[in-house]
UniProtKB/Swiss-Prot annotation:
Compartment(s) where it occurs, according to its Swiss-Prot or TrEMBL record: Cytoplasm
Keyword Transcription regulation assigned: yes
Source organism: Mycoplasma genitalium (strain ATCC 33530 / DSM 19775 / NCTC 10195 / G37) (Mycoplasmoides genitalium)
SUPFAM superfamilies associated with the record: HPr-like (SSF55594)
CDD domains reported for this sequence: PTS-HPr_like (cd00367)
Name assigned to this protein: Phosphocarrier protein HPr
Length: 88
């Protein structure tokens, strides 16, 4: 399992648009991908509803975890996606 931590820079947090973009990117990989909220609750990154239900807000510290055969590639792609869309 690989993971990284980040701080949410998007002023609205993780809302419908970034959740949709993340879920779409995550679905390209076989690994299990989880976003861990500051409360410790985990959400499946491949699920838009799961991501939005976490209530991630501006300045929240999050952890992204990947576990599986392509975990390194998946984690790098998710991080790049978050940075490209100015979420982190």
């Amino acid at each position: 399992m690989k993971k990284f931590q980040a701080v949410i820079k998007d002023p609205v947090g993780i809302h419908a648009r970034p959740a949709s973009i993340l879920a779409s990117e995550a679905s390209k990989f076989k690994s299990e991908l989880k976003l861990v909220a500051p409360s410790g609750v985990e959400g499946n990154i491949k699920s838009i509803i799961n991501l939005m239900s976490l209530g991630i807000r501006h300045n929240d510290n999050i952890t992204i975890k990947a576990d599986g055969a392509d975990e390194e590639e998946a984690l790098a792609a998710i991080k790049a996606c978050l940075e490209k869309n100015k979420v982190i």
